[in-house]
């Protein structure tokens, strides 16, 4: 499983780097999301995404994340470490102070491997704020809601609020 994660990350990095030499319509984002759903469930998802601007405001992309889940089930503390692969759509809705883009974003993904009981599909929607620049490194922050729909009976489906911080390389 670790080789699969490394391979996907390497392919996304190479793909984004090669395309960056041709145009700035491609971007790569490195970020971490922290999901909070009460004291018995937390999820941390370091992730990387490669996006392509279809129009000046609309972009689509692929996303890979390492989902680290910390849970307390019937008094027993457990953790899970799974990789997910998904896609995202975002739209630059408007600007604040002519230098900050407000961007609603929808992300959908599924776990890679991990067995039947541990796997899940997730849907995440949020509002992200980032600098309105065409090139260089920009920081972004975001917040929203994430829902994990587990396939097995090991975990119950969870909805959590999340905050995100990352860097956009364009």
Task: Name each region found by the language model.
Residues 1-25, 170:
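Cleavable N-terminal export/targeting peptides
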Residues 33-45, 73-79, 110-121, 150-158:
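Solvent-exposed loop/turn segments connecting transmembrane beta-strands
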Residues 20-68, 164-170:
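Short glycine/proline- and aromatic-enriched beta-strand/turn motifs that initiate or cap beta-hairpins
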Residues 113-170:
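Gram-negative outer-membrane beta-barrel domains
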Residues 6-9, 57, 162:
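Small-residue packing motifs within transmembrane alpha-helices
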Residues 31-37, 65-69, 105-113, 142-148, ...:
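Outer-membrane beta-barrel pore domains and translocons
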Residues 49-137:
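Gram-negative (and chloroplast) outer-membrane scaffold detector with strong preference
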């Amino acid at each position: 499983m670790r080789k699969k994660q490394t391979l996907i990350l390497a392919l996304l990095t190479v793909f984004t780097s090669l395309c960056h030499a041709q145009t700035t319509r491609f971007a790569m984002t490195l970020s971490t999301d922290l999901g909070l759903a009460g004291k018995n469930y937390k999820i941390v998802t370091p992730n990387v995404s490669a996006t392509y601007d279809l129009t000046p405001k609309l972009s689509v992309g692929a996303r890979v994340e390492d989902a680290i889940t910390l849970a307390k089930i019937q008094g027993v503390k457990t953790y899970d470490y799974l990789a997910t692969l998904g896609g995202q759509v975002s739209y630059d809705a408007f600007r604040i102070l002519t230098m900050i883009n407000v961007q609603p974003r929808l992300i959908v993904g599924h776990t890679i491997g991990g067995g039947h009981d541990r796997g899940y599909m997730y849907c995440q929607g949020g509002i992200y704020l980032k600098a309105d620049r065409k090139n260089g490194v920009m920081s972004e922050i975001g917040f929203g809601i994430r829902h994990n729909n587990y396939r097995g009976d090991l975990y119950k489906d969870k909805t959590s609020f999340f905050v995100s911080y990352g860097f956009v390389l364009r």
